[in-house]
């Protein structure tokens, strides 16, 4: 499964950032930047029929899952940036931290019981890593040997709070094999790392 190049991913987020800075988007958006290479390699291993559970920061995931650029941009412009889904592609998101982890584990259990060889890929950020739902789901998946992978996209931010501010000891559990982590440095236009412009939102009818 591979539908976008690195250049296309970056250009798309720059386009969304432009609309944001022009005041066209009086809604919350969460842009990505700096994690393109990792995601492209990861999505190359995904197959049709696999399930993807994304987060509020989902634009890269949606494009790599095959949602067309024009369709995704239209959804973002109408305020659905955090709620993108496509049931035909088994692609779902949620704006609530770690809320999809247990759902992903349940889908993986169903796939195993039905004899399917498809997998579930569940994304979360380093802020969601601190939520109990995540650990419950990981223990269930690992204990039942389910076809589910949890991908922690660690941009060292929970809203605007760094790991050292949230966890001064930097203590982290050793994760089982069903969890992989991508530590990356956020680059523009990643939300929280942009131009810090004062934006006047345009009236929406």
Walk through the language-model features, giving the residues of each.
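Conserved N-terminal diphosphate/IPP-binding helix and adjacent helical/loop segment
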Residues: 5-19
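Thiamine diphosphate
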Residues: 144-205
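Cofactor-binding active-site loop characterized by glycine-rich and histidine/acidic residues
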Residues: 14-17, 24-144, 162, 168-169
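Active-site-facing substrate-recognition patch
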Residues: 1
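Generic recognition of cysteine residues
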Residues: 4, 101-102, 122, 148, ...
